[in-house]
C-alpha cells in the first residue's frame, strides 16, 4: 500500500499504533512495526533511562521503523526528547502539550514529528512549527484531549490542512 504516510514513515501500511501509557512498550512496538505499521513506545512518565532501554530492546526485535510517543506533561520530557535523538529514533509522536521547544532539535536530527492535536488551531500551530503530520484525536481517545469528538476534529483539521 502506498500513501503519503507510508512514504513519510517508510512503513508498509498507514497505521500508527497509539503511544498508550504503560501499554505501548517494546514488545508491542516491535510487533506492530514487524507487521508493517509504525509501532510506538509510550514514554508516558518513564525516566529517560527506561525509555532508552525500551528503544534498545525494540531495535533488538525489529529493523523496521518505529517511534516514541513523548508525553509533554512528563517532567522528564526534555531528557526523553534528547534520548530520542541520542538513540537515533526517527519518528516521534507527542501528546499532552506543545512540542515546539523540542522541534528544532528533532528536525536537525532528521526526526519525523507527528503531534497529536485536538483542534484546528493546534494543527495549524504545529504545521507552522514544522510538524511533518498531525494525528487528529478527540475525547474518545482516552488521552489528554478536550471535549471535541474525533470525527469532528478530523473533518475540520483535514479541511484546514495545507496538504
Task: Identify the residue ranges that each predicted region occupies.
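Conserved small/polar residues in nucleotide/adenosyl-binding loops
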Residues: 156-161
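Active-site entrance/lid segments in N-terminal catalytic domains of soluble metabolic enzymes
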Residues: 1-155
